[in-house]
Amino acid sequence: MPDIKQRIKEREKMSSSKYVDRVLKDTIAKNADQKEFIQAVEEVLTSLTPVLKANPQYEENAILERMVQPERTIIFRVPWVDDKGIIRVNRGYRVQMNSAIGPYKGGLRFDPSVNLSVLKFLAFEQVFKNSLTTLPMGGGKGGSDFNPKQSPHTPGKRCSDAEVMRFCQSFMTGLYQYIGQDTDIPAGDMNVGGREIGYLFGQYKRLANEWTGVLTGKGLSYGGSLIRPEATGYGDVYFAENMLATRGETLEGKRCVVSGSGNVASYAAEKLMQLGAKVLTLSDRSGTLVFQDGLTAEQLAAVMELKNVKRGEFAELKMAGAKFVAKKNPWQTVSKYDCAFPCSRQNELDGKDAAYMLKNGVKLVGEGANMPCTPEAANAFIQAKLLYSPGKASNAGGVATSGLEMSQNSERISWTREQVDARLKDIMKAIHDNAYEAAAKYGKKGNYVVGANIAGFVKVADAMVAQGVC
């Protein structure tokens, strides 16, 4: 992390707003050890200068100062017993960032990388993402440093289902009093899928003695929504479709590189294939799978079985028509491609990757993960005038469909797959159009980063002004 004074000078060069400079300086000073959170705040605030100058009431009401501070941060211990009878203790978190436009909404992440900085960055991004969906949802994020992929007592083995269940039950015991269908509605995220959501929901129901839509991403047998697992990946591709349409192009025949192999990456790949694109890669922590002739439906099914059933890594997989490249990300593994969809994790794509991609003719980058591009990479794409969408806009399909699940739970109804998919398409088009129009309105036409930040910010800021100092 660079020296604080150096970072402040860098920010002052980028921003022409004294208000933004002041808030950034204070935020950096108070959160000097939280690099992910500072990166997210810098990216948003430095793009808001035009709207702040046009609306002095935001500074008068200290909107930025309040927006960068969580309304509430909950940290709790999570004790559980492993299969050997040994007591283990992890740390649990929930960052309730902003509830100006609705109850807190955002996922839970179980991974050793989880800390307060990561969750504050994700919660901050979630505020704007949820605002962009046009649904009444505030922003939050939570999780734990628990690693379900590594047994605490057997190296190279995963936690058993029983261990994951006991951990989830303990985690919910620490969290349940702070959440509720009108207060805070968590969902899944990294390493929190249908199995974990089921265990968490069961424990909440037991503790609260009520069945409510307190979690989204539930199974279809107990209140879940069709399309929810697919929604983030599908939405990312729908957003890319809308970006290409502004230049009279489609995804038909485009060569696409996708990173990741979880739900976001897998379903982005599926939708790309359905729309006539050729998917060249998927990846995980062990390396990248390259599909020289394009990913097939059969190969994707094998990947999803490996990840969702066997819970293995690509290094273990033998597949005809696929080449495994160990310890490499996809960006420089393939030489010629048109579109990139980073769907793995934050800061996975750096400045060197971006330079390689630009040199080799990439036309579009659609973020499926949260903040997967470093500032250097993002700036390179913006300067080159690529079709580049920030995750808060292009991966909002997941939380949008969570909002649709909340609606179905409230009404005690279930929509068809076609109904949910149609609503998802409409929401992604609305997000695209709002970001595109906001950028054009403030003199940044085609800059989806600025457009998404402004469009997401204004709705929340106006609500905060209307509600007074709270």
Residue ranges of model-derived segments:
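Rossmann-like adenosine-cofactor binding region
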Residues: 287-388, 393
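Adenosine-phosphate binding glycine-rich loop
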Residues: 7, 11-40, 243, 358-470
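Structural signal for hydrophobic packing residues in well-ordered secondary-structure cores
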Residues: 27-31, 45-52, 56, 123-131, ...
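General beta-strand structural signal in soluble alpha/beta enzymes
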Residues: 121, 183-187, 211-215, 281-284, ...
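Conserved active-site and cofactor/substrate-binding residues in soluble primary-metabolism enzymes
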Residues: 18, 32-39, 43, 58, ...
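N-terminal ligand-binding/catalytic initiation module
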Residues: 2-226, 459-469
